[in-house]
A protein has these predicted regions:
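Short cysteine/histidine-rich metal-coordination sites, predominantly Zn2+-binding motifs
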Residues: 110-121, 132-145
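N-terminal pre-ligand scaffold of iron-sulfur
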Residues: 27-111, 126-127, 143-159
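Bacterial Sec-dependent N-terminal signal peptides
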Residues: 1-8, 13-44
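Generic detector of short alpha-helix boundary/capping microenvironments
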Residues: 11-13, 84-85, 119, 135
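Extracellular secreted precursors and ectodomains with disulfide-bonded cysteine-rich loops/domains
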Residues: 22, 94, 116-119
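Intrinsically disordered, low-complexity segments enriched in small/polar residues
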Residues: 1-3, 53, 129
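Polar low-complexity intrinsically disordered regions enriched in Ser/Thr and small residues
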Residues: 6-8, 71, 76, 116, ...
Length: 159
């Protein structure tokens, strides 16, 4: 017998299957290969003092405050950590996705204020909008890493 309860069950089953299948797919725009990223930033450390103000950023790499290879990003180009709101941080790989897709070149973007620019292809990426390209040939955003904030510490990871 088919009643309202069985139609709802079928609908819920379809929704669950669709969600589980879509969550397994790699993001189409994530063209930079995965590397291990896992580090903490202490906002009381003078090296990261700029992150105490909304709209500021810091560049993190292997040598930053002895964070090591887990703060290197792809091909040791480093990671941009940007404070977008009081309790929200955005972490982006500095590798230009356009140059990587084109020929496998690994070029670190330069950061000035709220924009990052590739010195090779001249694509510009907006930090407040999660590294979305705003000009130039790039069709891909900068690779983004997960962040969490606990009041004093910002955790950046791809786990």
């Amino acid at each position: 017998m088919s009643g309202p309860g069985s139609k709802l069950s079928i609908f819920l089953l379809i929704c669950i299957v669709s969600l589980s299948l879509s969550s397994c797919k790699k993001q189409k725009n994530d063209v930079i290969p995965d590397v291990t990223v896992d580090f903490y930033i202490d906002l009381t450390d003078p090296e990261f003092f700029d992150l105490n103000a909304i709209g500021n950023h810091v560049l993190v790499n292997y040598n930053t405050n002895n964070l090591g290879y887990k703060a290197s990003g792809y091909d040791n180009n480093g990671i941009i950590v940007y404070r977008s709101q009081t309790d929200e941080f955005i972490a982006l790989d500095r590798t230009c996705p356009h140059d990587y897709v084109l020929d496998g070149t690994s070029i670190a973007v330069n950061v000035d204020g709220v924009y990052a620019e590739c010195p090779l292809c001249k694509s510009t990426y907006a930090l407040p909008s999660f590294g979305t390209p705003t000009s130039g040939p790039s069709k891909y955003p900068l690779k983004m890493y997960r962040t969490s904030f606990t009041g004093q510490f910002v955790h950046v990871t791809n786990y």
